[in-house]
Structures are given as structure tokens and as C-alpha cells.
Amino acid sequence: DATPTGYLTTVLDNQGNEIATLVASGSNRKNVTIDEIPINLQHAFVALEDSRFYEHNGIDLTGIIRAGVTGIASGGNFSQGASTITQQLLKNTVFTEWTSETSFIDKLERKIQEQYLAVQLEKKVSKNWIMENYLNAINLGQNTLGVAVASERYFGKDVSELTLSECAVLAAITQNPSRFNPISNPEKNAERRMKVLNNMLDQGFISQSEYDEAVADNVYDRIQLVNVELQDNGINSYFKIGRASCR
């Protein structure tokens, strides 16, 4: 089953008002439907992670060949990924022990299984189903899983309200949530955010004027302001008081 599991628990008072959110480790996730996720956010991840997502059948042979050629040309460094969004969904929901792999054989075995299941999954479900579950499953740093909670954590808003600039920030995190954390490493995130926007422009997802507006946006100042507000309200990784109740 490639559907994400583990969600936060909302505590309500006797009048139905949210007063707290209980978060177990690995469960800080809210489920959102594909209709609630901005198309720019979907395209940001496609542009950066899997440009042929809407064309391939689960694995991207072109990407695999490109990664192989790059690895050979670099003297055996095969660090360039060729995993599709479908494969990444499976890695995050089925092969959850991948971080403990200790050998090349372990990684290769998992990759082969991943590729096989990716093709089988794409025979059974739509691209929208895959995208929805992928965006609900990904680790986006700061103990957030999925774009809904990450949107609240970094921008203090519902995911449906994200601007293009903010969408690019979230997509920039996913390769390495620690290194590209927009709070602790805004410069690194900004570099990768530019790659997201450049890819979106090159792949025809956005216009030049949309690109220019996003590039000019001072998004990192807003992120720091939201972070300060959340810290003032006593947020932490495992138990956070609902923001609405702390105003």
C-alpha cells in the first residue's frame, strides 16, 4: 500500500474549537486532496524531480541512461538520482527502511523492487493519485511530512494559498531537508529554489512574467517571521499548541 500513514491528532474544546495538536514522531502529516494542492506546487516538484512524470510508465529510462553516462564520465560517481516521483512515493511509504541500507547490494535490490512496483502501480492508479500521495508523504524538514503541514510550518498558511515563490521553496527542500532547510540554510535553499524556477520556465510550466515576479519575492524574510511567531507561541517537534488558540 503506497498510501501515507501516520497523521497528527487535533484536540478540540467542548465547543469544537481547536486548542492543541498532538504530534508523534513521524506522524506530523495532514492529508490534502490533489484539488487542494496548487498546480504550481505540483509542477515545481515535477520540474525539479521528474520532468517526464506525465509521460513515463513509472520508471524513466531516459533518466536512468543519463545518470549512468554521468556516473561513468565522473569516474564512477553514480550519485545522480534517476528515481521518478512514483518510485519516490514507494520509497517513502513501502521501503521505509531505506535509510538503514549499508551496502550497494542492499540499495540495488531495493531499487529493482522499487522500479518493478512503480510500473505495476502506474497500471492501477492515475498520475493524480500518485502526485497526491507523494505530496502527502514527503519529508520537508522541521518534523513536517507532506506539503500541508510544511506550508503551515514555513509560511503560516494553508497549502492552497501558496504563491509560486513559496511553492518553489518547498520543492527545493525535498532532496535534502536538512541542507536545504529554508530556516537554517536559506542561502542553500535559495540556490535550489532558483533551479526550480528555471526548470519550470524551461519546461513551460510558468511564463517569463511569473518567473520574474517569483524571483523578486523576498520570501525568506516571511519564513523567518513565521518561525519567530511559532517559537513565541511555544511550538516544538512533538507537541504544539494550535496557533489559533495562542493569539
Predicted stretch roles:
Residues 241-246:
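Conserved small/polar residues in nucleotide/adenosyl-binding loops
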Residues 231-239:
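Extracytoplasmic/periplasmic solute-binding protein
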Residues 193, 206-230:
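Terminal amphipathic helices with adjacent charged low-complexity linkers/tails
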Residues 1-5:
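Aromatic-capped interface at the extracytoplasmic side
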Residues 13-205:
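Peptidoglycan glycan-strand catalytic modules in the bacterial/periplasmic cell-wall system
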